[in-house]
Amino acid sequence: VISLRRLFALATAAAAASLAPALALADPAPAAGTLLTDPGLTPQLKILALLTLLSLLPAVVLTMTSFTRVVVVLGFVRHGIGTQQSPPTQVIVGLALFLSAFTMAPVTTAIARDAWEPYSAGRITAEQAVAAATTPLRSFMLRQTRESDLALFYEAARQPLPQTEEEVPLRIAAPAFVVSELTTAFQMGVMVLLPFLVIDLVVSALLMSMGMMMVPPSTLSLPIKLLLFVVADGWHLLVGSLLRSFA
């Protein structure tokens, strides 16, 4: 089970790392981690720096974790079955968050071990903690990123391709990762929608052959699709496929 402290460490590290290029181009100023630990700053400024990092949490969850793939595939399932509001959007998002937390467990564990705990104990600086936290997060994203998507952003940035993954900055790894996640999610969505599409076509053909053209096909196809999904243990197969896709 992933603790809230580990999730907070992941979000803080990713947010600080994503801000690093912009901070480097700006006028010399304390880094995000330094703002939280500088004894010369007032508590109000420290709270402001912390709230700034927390405001980036939704962007971190959407662009640097497995959440995007999971929530898109779950949305395709609901659309394919034809139940517009069941399961509710809140349930889909909640399930996607918990599945994302489960798949990101090795990353958060590595961040807590290599970055958060040493930094909390005062053994490393804030900059060293950000660098240590970035390594497992970047490694996870690059494992799920297609080379063509990564090359696309390097070409757009007019930079040579890196030789090692340590040379890939998060400002390039994150968008390439999101594009790859959307591609994978749509591929899985096609496989999910095909059986439901076949049922819709068969039901429509049967209704037309029986002269019942005024009967909406969804009236008969919805119970059949629900029955098929339940008999096939659809949620078990779906969640298992999603988890294995990140292995």
Regions picked out by a protein language model, each given a short descriptive name:
Residues 6, 23-247:
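Hydrophobic alpha-helical segments and their helix-loop boundaries in membrane
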Residues 1-27:
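N-terminal secretory/membrane targeting signals
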